[in-house]
Regions:
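Structural recognition of the beta-strand scaffold that forms the well-ordered cores
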Residues: 1-3, 24-29, 63-67, 83-88, ...
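Generic structural signal for hydrophobic
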Residues: 15-18, 77, 109, 136
Length: 175
């Protein structure tokens, strides 16, 4: 789960639960701000703020981030130092789409190593995630955390590098 840093402490119980259930917990920026409109110094301060919150809740930091709006070039230019996890399948759930529409649009997109983008801001997303996970299992896919996905192929996530997917050690990246 990529979580907005400033929301971690107010929702510490959810952060702890996600971690306890084996999910990866990582950064989705401190404020969900547009990195193109934030100073480089402020961007570089985000990892410490996010990691302080994570350490106070689950005892461990993160080393990666999903940049709001996908504007990772600003983060790389500022040399923030995280690995950036983007996505290869976008559900557009944030638009309020129904589960059936999301499934019909995404089913044909899935391939091994994909990273799926979903949000927690819409009431329908948990149900969509459940339906999607069940369908993916039926198709023979295995769901992995980001760490598991890259570790299975021996890929080390590098700072200031963007990752979109990983399959058999082949990553789609940008530096």
């Amino acid at each position: 789960f990529f979580m907005i840093g400033k929301n971690m402490k107010p929702y510490a119980d959810l952060v702890q639960r996600a971690h306890d259930e084996g999910h990866a917990v990582a950064s989705h920026n401190w404020t969900h701000g547009d990195a193109r409109k934030i100073s480089a110094a402020t961007l570089r301060a985000m990892p410490e703020k996010v990691n302080n919150a994570l350490i106070s809740i689950i005892g461990i930091p993160t080393r990666y981030d999903r940049v709001p709006y996908g504007v990772y070039p600003a983060m790389i230019k500022a040399k923030v130092g995280w690995a950036y996890i983007q996505w290869s399948v976008d559900t557009y759930d944030w638009r309020g789409r129904s589960t059936s529409l999301i499934m019909s649009k995404t089913k044909k997109q899935f391939t091994d190593g994909d990273i799926v983008l979903m949000h927690d801001i819409k009431d329908n997303t948990p149900n969509t995630a459940k339906v999607m996970a069940e369908w993916l299992y039926e198709q023979g896919y295995i769901l992995l955390t980001v760490d598991e996905l890259f570790a299975k192929d021996g890929v080390t996530l590098e700072p200031d590098t963007v990752y979109f997917r990983c399959d058999d050690g082949v990553t789609t990246i940008k530096k």
